[in-house]
Amino acid sequence: MCNHHPQHSHDNDTIRIRGARTHNLKNIDLDIPRHKLVVVTGLSGSGKSSLAFDTLYAEGQRRYVESLSAYARQFLQMMDKPDVDLIEGLSPAISIEQKSTSHNPRSTVGTVTEIHDYLRLLYARVGTPYCPEHKLPLSSQTVSQMVDAVLKLPEDTRVMILAPTVRERKGEFVDFFADLQAQGFARVRVDGEVYQLDEVPKLEKNIKHNIDVVIDRVKVKADIKQRLAESFETALRHGNERALAMEMDSGEEHWFSARFACPVCSYSLPELEPRLFSFNNPMGSCPTCDGLGNTNFFDPEKVVAHPELSLATGAIDGWDKRNQFYFQMIQSLARHYGFDVQAAWETLPEKVKKVVLHGSGKEVIDFTYLSERGTTFNRSHAFEGIIPNLERRYRETDSETVREKLREYQNHRACPSCGGARLRKEARYVYVSGEPLHEVSAWPLTKTHQFFETLDLDGNKKQIAEKILKEITERLGFLINVGLDYLNLSRSAETLSGGEAQRIRLASQIGSGLTGVMYVLDEPSIGLHQRDNDRLLATLKRLRDLGNSVIVVEHDEDAIREADFVVDMGPGAGEHGGNVLIADTPENVAQCENSVTGQYLSGKKSIAVPSERTPVNPDRMLVLKGARGNNLKNVTLELPLGLITCITGVSGSGKSTLINDTLAKITARELNRAQEEPAPFDDIHGLEHLDKVINVDQSPIGRTPRSNPATYTGLFTPIRELFAGVPLSRERGYNVGRFSFNVKGGRCEACQGDGVIKVEMHFLPDVYVPCEVCHGKRYNRETLEIQYKGKNISQVLDMTVEEAREFFDAVPTVSRKLQTLMDVGLGYIRLGQSATTLSGGEAQRVKLALELSKRDTGRTLYILDEPTTGLHFADIALLLEVIGRLKGKGNSIVIIEHNLDVIKTADWIVDLGPEGGDGGGRIIAKGSPEQVAKVKGSYTGKYLKVVLR
């Protein structure tokens, strides 16, 4: 062991841990310096998360929460109390994990980071509202301001002062004119023409008119101030607080209002307040879409599911021969419009398609219906149309099942009223420096940041906005510093990847400016390109410099080298881990012989660059043309089959859109018959070389404690068959079901096969206590009497994969699957370990193992999204071996990855970029790693050059 003896100090600069035994920790003692950047590293499963999250964070949070009242505690999720003798020097803890943010469609990047709240405040305090129709600013002027505005015109300009009295109203207005004459007025302007009051022509009764009373006619001179003031006062009195000054020679009009309103149409707003700009408040949200920005509609492309078929044979589900009532309507339409119900839908004239889908309008059609009794009856009415029919049924039904069914024909589109802005009309026409809020929110963060940095307001507006602007620009700056410059504030939070969501939380934490806190982060570098790594590390150091302890579980080499202190866990994983190998500075860790991390840091061990690359076979290519989802710019992707291809590029360059949203969904639809809707593309060639596609992601293998590696990989069934075949089982008549803990029979009924009983504690975390009847064994006594090679079913579930591999050596169906779990480096997990306790990286490798154990055709396309998440250098070497085996059988592997060790070993690279967001979405480079390293504009190439030397 390398030196890591805890000092016996009682200073305030150390977090002292004594006797930590959480999960697989082996009673460890450890001192960690406070207010430093500490990286916890080690193999996958070596106990990093157990130390950082389940011990340090859990205890820090628990102590803080316990200081609250019992009433407040019941609303907080309490962590389990870690199994540890003593922890001293803890601060209140905040964890920033990789869970995706909320699944609430109302959450956006702006609301999650609270920038939107500051923007609402800014627009409410210094925004200028405009009239949506006349595009004039709403403003109120005093009489003296109106006079000054007229006096600013060139001297001797002839001006007519008018009072706008009638706007867009029908009528003859005879009495109105008589009334004006009685009040002593001489002239009026009717529909733009000026008349003497006694010469006004007779007005058309059914046409809308505009009438202004002429109050005064003046030439602009300095000495007419008093006269103008009196004229304006009269005009305001008669013109409903509005007045109009018209230059008589040019006809140009200057509108004035004494009320806060549009001088032309009197459109006015109550006082601007922040909630007018909130799409989550009825006062601000667009009434059509309720502030969601999009509406559901019945999509003709989904309604006509099979355009190649005829209406009679099922072009439109539910309207073909099998549905007599609806099909009779179609036949009557065919008679009326003269088309053939047996003709393919795509060959029908556009007019016919329009009538069938959207109805006949006012045109009446003769319908003939045949009742079930065989009687014929006729009806004449307009045809509703299939889409209006679906809309009506969707509105009127009370059945959730019918709604679910109808939803299959729906799609989203931007809301027709607000165009996706989410806000009501009034809020969309309030401007700051000429820009409305929804436009600013749709820009990439770099542009938004620049706009507010250079925003120049005048007078007291500047003073009001100063503090708000400081908050906005700072927070935007933090988001840009964690590599999220390509996002925009209106981006929905549910579309963010785990890494993006985590970095947004990180930026929000810096924005909150807390000090004296212990932050625990889980691999913040996930999904980040090497280029943005330095900015992320600078952000972490900034958190530390505010006076916080920053503890990061991380495998990234740069992060380990930049840390103030490194804790290396190991030596193995699971049972073989849980010890601290060394806790010291990065330099000393690199010197440590026993530490695998140290060996990789010092260069004693490394992942080798392959000596030769597998050549590309031009006859076996998968070509995807014209991909244009999200920010992709009409991309054509060429994938050589039978090789390992890495898709690289900075965050937000379009990798996930191209692979997960386009390629994976097209191939799943064509090869696996999945109901997937890919992002827009033109064409795909080369699918004949493949027979299935498998997307191996990091989602959990099961969400309940009953799901475990044995059930997921299908190991458990042959194991139960072995137990059912034991002579004693046969004698008692036990079958395979007897050995399942999910059904009655063999399981312990007291805990229903869970092995633990949940006790609700209300103010404290729920406690799981071992079942008193079976003592956590999950089965009843009779079942446990059955033994195979001296072990019962519960003891088998408690074995690690490694132990089970030896135990079942003679049973090929079982040992083959166990061997693949060993191959992906999961020898340490227990067969019955609850799926909920597996990390994302472990879950992904269980899936890989399952794929490896299947019989193989060698024509599979595997898609992996950042498989190195949660993996140490040594684990990556193992993963590359497994992927190499898949390739060896002739399969094709596509990996989205930022890790240079994986990228340098690929046969082919497709690099997207050059930037994220709008600045990305193009293929910058493609070819072998050596070829990509030579491409000037490629960031990936720049970093590859260094590792390929």
Swiss-Prot record:
A zinc finger (C4-type) spans 262-289, 748-774. ATP binds at residues 42-49, 649-656. Keywords: ATP-binding, Cytoplasm, DNA damage, DNA excision, DNA repair, DNA-binding, Excision nuclease, Metal-binding, Nucleotide-binding, Repeat, SOS response, Zinc, Zinc-finger. The UvrABC repair system catalyzes the recognition and processing of DNA lesions. UvrA is an ATPase and a DNA-binding protein. A damage recognition complex composed of 2 UvrA and 2 UvrB subunits scans DNA for abnormalities. When the presence of a lesion has been verified by UvrB, the UvrA molecules dissociate. PROSITE patterns: ABC_TRANSPORTER_1, ABC_TRANSPORTER_2. Belongs to the ABC transporter superfamily. UvrA family. Its main location: cytoplasm. HAMAP family: UvrA. The gene is uvrA. This is UvrABC system protein A. One of its GO terms (molecular function) is ATP hydrolysis activity. Pfam families: UvrA_DNA-bind (PF17755), UvrA_inter (PF17760). It comes from the Bacteria. GO terms for cellular component: cytoplasm; excinuclease repair complex.
